[in-house]
Amino acid sequence: MSLLQFSGLFVVWLLCTLFIATLTWFEFRRVRFNFNVFFSLLFLLTFFFGFPLTSVLVFRFDVGVAPPEILLQALLSAGCFYAVYYVTYKTRLRKRTTDVPRRPLFTMNRVETNLTWVILMGIALVSVGIFFMHNGFLLFRLNSYSQIFSSEVSGVALKRFFYFFIPAMLVVYFLRQDSKAWLFFLVSTVAFGLLTYMIVGGTRANIIIAFAIFLFIGIIRGWISLWMLAAAGVLGIVGMFWLALKRYGMNVSGDEAFYTFLYLTRDTFSPWENLALLLQNYDNIDFQGLAPIVRDFYVFIPSWLWPGRPSMVLNSANYFTWEVLNNHSGLAISPTLIGSLVVMGGALFIPLGAIVVGLIIKWFDWLYELGNRETNRYKAAILHSFCFGAIFNMIVLAREGLDSFVSRVVFFIVVFGACLMIAKLLYWLFESAGLIHKRTKSSLRTQVEG
């Protein structure tokens, strides 16, 4: 890449970054937080944060990258995607009407809400316990990170339930919403994330997500400033780099450490070059249609229920890894959101995907606002826990693609909804057995006086 080519790319990168950052800033000033703000920051991180890192790798360490015209296509496709997404998100689908009282879809009380978070936490802890009994601490047993996907590790399906510890702790926080509950959320979820990091053998997702949710709650409540958020972001990048070194068993120093920091940080937070690699091989892609979305559900079907289930699932990430990169190391390489759309239907699917994503984020913001307006604090805690708990799925959406997002968000909704139903069933059984006694003002006054 020549200096002139880099200058052209830099101008395009700067314009796209300023465009998205400006719209995000105006939205932040208007509402302080919603899921449009979160997705916009996530989109910036995924598709634009990596460009400066790539530039340093090219000019400082002479690392080979895709041709400049392909990198330009990647930047422009990301910028155009966001423009279509933003217009879709801001488009009003129906006329604004005065709030008419409607019959609520469901209600929650204190016992049902507490039962819900206990069940969610129980699912996570039991899953971790069973996985640990089968495999022990994989971080200290395996020689390479790719081995966690091998036949040496049993009970891999249990890892999908670990994440429900975070929604459980979110319910606990939203029931109190004070600084002590906020700090308790951070300590409990990060501690759980570190435990799963050691047990699973290097998975950092629970730690990243817990820390991100903690920061956004702090921003919403005004407990941290933007400068503190930026400092925490830098600390998070350094922390993730250190965990990555431990995961891959690397011991580096000097220039090698700087080089390793650049490419690991780029691959962890901003795999935008993967989109460029897909575009570089555009003519060789056999468009998969909507099949990757259907195939991604295969991993949630037990083999005893479907004996002939394919052992290898050809979703967009695996198609990119196996067919485009010809990489059979055992790791699936993230194609990014736009990359997954390219795999499914080429350039035509990019604006269509942007419209779909705009509607998805719009739905989450509608649900979030519903929680903000809810007068029943227990129902509000459940709604907010569901919305913030889905942040993991939005990260999957930006990094892994639309197919991975759809299967995971459906799984999340099913498990979360099942926990709600079980909590309500248990409450009904306890109440029928006479074990539930409603609190009265007189009993509360007696407790206080006593």
From Swiss-Prot:
The chain crosses the membrane at residues 6-26, 37-57, 63-83, 118-138, 155-175, 181-201, 207-227, 228-248, 341-361, 378-398, 410-430. GO terms for cellular component: plasma membrane. It comes from the Bacteria. It is a multi-pass membrane protein. GO terms for biological process: enterobacterial common antigen biosynthetic process. Belongs to the WzyE family. Probably involved in the polymerization of enterobacterial common antigen (ECA) trisaccharide repeat units. This is Probable ECA polymerase. It comes from Escherichia fergusonii (strain ATCC 35469 / DSM 13698 / CCUG 18766 / IAM 14443 / JCM 21226 / LMG 7866 / NBRC 102419 / NCTC 12128 / CDC 0568-73). The gene is wzyE.
